[in-house]
Amino acid sequence: MHVIIDYGMGNLASVQRAFEKLQVDVKVSSRKEDLRNATSLILPGVGAFRDAINLLDESGLTSVIKEEVAKGKYIIGICLGMQLLYEKSFEYGEYDGLGLINGSIEYLDVNLKVPHMGWNNLKFTNDNPILKYIKEDEYVYFVHSYYAASDNSEVLAYADYEKMVPAIVRKNNVYGIQFHPEKSGETGLNILKAYKEIIEN
């Protein structure tokens, strides 16, 4: 059983439907025991980093997530969920994240329209099994105003939006997707299909 973490913010139903379409055994839960018993964790999210991390802290889920990931359990963060994986965010102040990936979440300060909303193509930087069913330059759907600023060693794919915007990242058993795979058609499903194979092997 793979658990979609319900902390009060997130596109839970659409993420759940996407995984179920791929016949992944998923459950939405906010119970610590379910997270501990899960095969892997899925961290969705829509909204502000500050609100999300406060809800995770208040519910006691922050420490459980860190403990389970430290044991080697896979986690994938989607959209805001990916941003929560980083050390800190500068959205509406300065807030500590889960600290599972080095780097910080910063405002996407570009001359283009912000939020970065709509379809953009992916460029690959590192090979990884999560990319096995897609080709470079396939389009996925983004909605965000902040992005992950890091040394980019964890970046597997990025979108060019005047800046290099990390789109898929990975550090050991921690994966993150900045765009919405559940809204990205066949390309998004193919990414989740590849991730399914990673967590079920």
Stretches with model-predicted labels:
Residues H2-V24, P181-K183:
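N-terminal beta1-alpha1 ligand-phosphate binding loop
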Residues V26-N37:
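Short acidic low-complexity segments
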Residues I42-P44:
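Structural motif
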Residues G47-M117:
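Cysteine-nucleophile active-site neighborhood
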Residues K88-K163:
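Pocket-forming structural segment of enzyme catalytic cores
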Residues K163-R170:
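Short, surface-exposed beta-strand/loop micro-motifs that present aromatic residues
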Residues I177-N201:
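Acyltransferase
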